[in-house]
Structure formats: structure tokens, C-alpha cells
Amino acid sequence: MATKVTVFANGKARQVSAEKTVAEMVRDLKLTPAAVLVERNGRALLRQEWEMERVEHGDRLEFVKVVAGG
């Protein structure tokens, strides 16, 4: 059984696998990767980092949907 950690996604505590990547979190939350920015513990992540960055206990993740319009 995979070890679980607690992370905070947009302020809400979530139990997730300790092996989960930021990219997997984006998919789990059904967000469109091209239309979202991710901040981890106060640092903005580049999209190419998402597959390499594994969540850790206590991480604070902010998923910000980008909206454009006039």
C-alpha cells in the first residue's frame, strides 16, 4: 500500500500518494494544463517541472486558472 501524505491544494487538505507528481495532481483535479499556473510553497513552477516534482507532506499547492478575455 502506498504511503499517503497530506498536502494543501488551494487551501484544502488532501490525502495523496507520496509518489504523486504535480502533473498527476493537475490531472486528478481535472484542470487543463495549458490554462493553469501552479505554485508550490510560494514558488511558481514551470510546466516542464510538473512531471519531476513529487509532492511532500505539508506542501501548499495553489492551482490558478488562467482566464483571458476582453
Feature map (PLM): residue ranges:
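Ubiquitin-like/PB1-type beta-grasp interaction modules and other compact soluble beta-rich domains
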Residues: 1-69
